[in-house]
């Protein structure tokens, strides 16, 4: 197994990309700590599935914009699972579409706290317990193209994740590798809420693969970046969008 004997933390692991990633890492031998904020049923279901297959896992609710919640997650992971080898920084969101001219500072700060500052805080807390390993960040296609109307703040936060990924890879290598993936249209609750159906159909018609991505597509890439199959890759921001950039 590609991650036998290793421990992974997956933030935002109660649904969609995070849940699929937690299950995928566990299927390759990792013990998994699943952070969630509101998706308790999905997080618990993932833990039950992992344990049913002979693995180790737990789920813990936490707001990763709060230091106490981060500290609790890291401490429980180290105590119960024995350390930290893989960190998947998946927590994030758009919150709501708001154009810059109409946006309050509080909304801007909330997006930055959720998508960027929480990644800094989580990464710093985990690095205290990582001698070697991998960090996988979730950026976005929006960081490449600026996002749609009302998503400028979201795109900016994800652009910062891409830059932080490159810089951190230089700062903490060679012992720890850091990479990010930049998903395009993935069939998730995020797009169910924030992307009109017509836009989703248009995406499917325009990209070379003629479909939206699945959470399994992203989980496969997360596994690749987390394990030694990608041993010569660090500081990379990898597109996973069905060919959107050149369609």
PLM-predicted stretches and their roles:
Residues 7, 14-16:
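Conserved glycine-rich cofactor-binding loop
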Residues 94-97, 205, 211, 223, ...:
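Short C-terminal tail/terminal secondary-structure segment
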Residues 98-100, 107-109, 191, 199, ...:
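Substrate-binding pocket helix/loop in short-chain dehydrogenase/reductase
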Residues 101-120, 136, 161, 209:
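Catalytic Tyr-X3-Lys loop
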Residues 103, 146-155, 167:
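Active-site loop-to-helix junction immediately N-terminal to the catalytic Tyr of the SDR YXXXK motif
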Residues 123, 157, 165:
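Active-site helix of classical SDR
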Residues 128, 169-174, 231:
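Alpha-helical segment proximal to the catalytic Tyr-Lys
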Residues 140:
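Residue(s) in the substrate-gating loop at a strand-loop-helix junction
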């Amino acid at each position: 197994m590609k991650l036998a004997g290793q421990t992974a933390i997956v933030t935002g692991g109660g649904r969609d990309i995070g849940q699929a990633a937690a299950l995928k890492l566990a299927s390759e031998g990792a013990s998994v700590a699943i952070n969630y904020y509101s998706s308790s049923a999905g997080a618990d279901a993932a833990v039950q599935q992992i344990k049913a297959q002979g693995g180790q896992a737990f789920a813990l609710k936490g707001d990763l914009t709060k230091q106490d919640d981060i500290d609790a997650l890291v401490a429980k992971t180290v105590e119960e699972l024995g350390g930290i080898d893989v960190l998947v920084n998946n927590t994030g969101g758009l919150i709501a579409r708001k154009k810059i001219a109409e946006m309050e500072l509080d909304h801007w700060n909330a997006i930055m706290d959720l998508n960027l500052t929480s990644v800094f805080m989580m990464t710093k807390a985990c690095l205290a317990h990582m001698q070697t390993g991998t960090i996988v960040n979730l950026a976005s296609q929006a960081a490449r193209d600026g996002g749609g109307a009302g998503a400028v703040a979201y795109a900016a936060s994800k652009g910062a994740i891409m830059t932080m990924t490159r810089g951190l890879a230089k700062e903490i290598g060679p012992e720890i590798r850091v990479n990010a993936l930049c998903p395009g249209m993935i069939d998730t609750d995020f797009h169910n809420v924030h992307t009109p159906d017509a836009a989703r159909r248009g995406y499917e018609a325009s990209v070379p693969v003629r479909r939206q991505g699945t959470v399994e597509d992203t989980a496969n890439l997360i596994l690749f970046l987390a394990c030694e199959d990608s041993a010569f890759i660090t500081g990379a921001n990898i597109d996973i969008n069905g060919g959107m950039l050149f369609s």
